[in-house]
Curated annotation (Swiss-Prot):
Similarity comment: family membership: Belongs to the PRA-PH family.
InterPro entries in UniProt: HisE, PRib-ATP_PPHydrolase-like
Gene from which this protein is expressed: hisE
Native organism: Nocardioides sp. (strain ATCC BAA-499 / JS614)
Cellular compartment(s): Cytoplasm
An example Gene Ontology molecular-function term: ATP binding
Name of the molecule in the record: Phosphoribosyl-ATP pyrophosphatase
Amino acid sequence: MKTFDELWAELSEKARSRPEGSGTVRALDAGVHGIGKKLVEEAAESWMAAEHEGPERAAEEISQLLYHAQVLMLATGIDLDDVYAHL
């Protein structure tokens, strides 16, 4: 299990080092539009899982939503402090 901050550190390192075969690198290469489409997809899947599939599936989908939100943050140059300033 990892925290939101630990995920951020991991994804930031992948964005910096760009390891071959990385799904994060592929997502970043898709650009803001591609990442945004994936974020919307994961939001819908989170909602559907919460409404129809139960807490375990909802948690899984929400984890994917958070992952793609962080990838979008990396693609746009937003860091955790930028987001935390609005919480």
